[in-house]
């Protein structure tokens, strides 16, 4: 890994799946034409809102489901690594809630990895929507995922996971060099915490962070923060977006990783290890 260009795609997805996929297609093409070899989509890129996730999830149990097929075909078309935000995937048992699955596809369209979102956003906030209950629709994942890529070891996380630093410490123990974190932070929490949490995860784990967010007004009661960002292992913001659709890009460089880790050899000094 040396000088690999990566991109984060910011969207304002709604409930119209066909429209969302078309916007994703255009934005991914923009990133690829700019030289990106790894492109990361935001959480819920294909459907964001009150649409029935169970109907989508049932179709995506099959690797040939429409959303998974879209991701595979798009990765293959552009010859890129593609992190597909999250899509709902039904469980094996009929009564089991779907998982919010984040897929990584290779340049040839093959599936390299799947991460199911572990930490579900069940909170009450003083905003227009007020009540968020992801666990009403989804079951939590159970397994950490870190996969070898041309960008180095790529760790996967999603949105609310960001608030649980022990998860990323465990990924660091598995050799993570780059973290992809598809997200849909609310405007309220994003304005307060988004950048500081992302910079903290980059600095404390000495990794690159690629964090695409949903960014805008989705409905009368839903607004996300935006502010998609790419951060280096020293905590420097290499690229950022405001609100609305955007594509941001930067270079992931092995020499920068090595320099940060040599300057502050915290991995060698670590005395406490997170189980798992």
Where are these regions (language model features)?
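Extreme N-terminal starter segment of soluble prokaryotic enzymes
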Residues: 1-7
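Short polar catalytic/cofactor-binding loops
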Residues: 10-15
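Cys-nucleophile CN-hydrolase/nitrilase-fold catalytic domain and related Cys-dependent amidase chemistry
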Residues: 17, 26-116, 185-201, 205-207
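Short, acidic/polar
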Residues: 19-30, 163-169
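CN hydrolase (nitrilase-like) catalytic-core segments centered on the catalytic cysteine
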Residues: 63-83, 153, 159-248
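Short beta-strand scaffold segments in enzyme catalytic cores
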Residues: 84-86, 100-104, 145-147, 228-230, ...
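Active-site catalytic loop in hydrolytic enzyme cores
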Residues: 93-174, 187-190, 196, 262-266
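A conserved C-terminal secondary-structure "cap"
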Residues: 257-276
């Amino acid at each position: 890994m040396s000088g690999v260009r990566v991109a984060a795609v910011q969207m304002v997805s709604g409930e119209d799946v066909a429209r969302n996929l078309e916007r994703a297609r255009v934005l991914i093409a923009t990133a690829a034409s700019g030289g990106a070899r790894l492109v990361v989509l935001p959480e819920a890129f294909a459907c964001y809102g009150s649409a029935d996730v169970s109907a989508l999830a049932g179709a995506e149990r099959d690797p040939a489901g429409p959303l998974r097929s879209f991701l595979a075909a798009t990765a293959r078309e552009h010859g890129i690594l593609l992190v597909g935000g999250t899509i709902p995937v039904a469980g094996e048992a009929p009564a089991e809630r779907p998982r919010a699955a984040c897929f990584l596809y290779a340049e040839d369209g093959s599936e390299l990895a799947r991460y199911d979102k572990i930490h579900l956003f069940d909170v009450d906030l003083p905003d227009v929507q007020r009540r968020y209950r992801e666990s009403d629709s989804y079951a939590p994942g159970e397994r950490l995922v870190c996969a070898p890529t041309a960008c180095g070891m790529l760790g996967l996380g999603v949105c609310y996971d960001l608030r649980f630093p022990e998860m990323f410490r465990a990924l660091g123990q598995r050799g993570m060099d780059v973290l992809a974190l598809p997200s849909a932070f609310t405007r309220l929490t994003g304005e307060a915490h988004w950048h500081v949490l992302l910079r903290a995860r980059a600095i404390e784990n000495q990794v690159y962070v690629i964090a695409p967010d949903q960014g805008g007004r989705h409905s009368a009661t839903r607004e996300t923060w935006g502010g998609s960002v790419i951060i280096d292992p020293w905590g420097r913001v290499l690229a950022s977006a405001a609100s609305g659709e955007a594509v941001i890009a930067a270079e992931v460089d092995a020499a920068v990783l090595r320099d940060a880790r040599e300057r502050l050899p915290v991995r060698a000094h670590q005395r406490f290890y997170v189980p798992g």
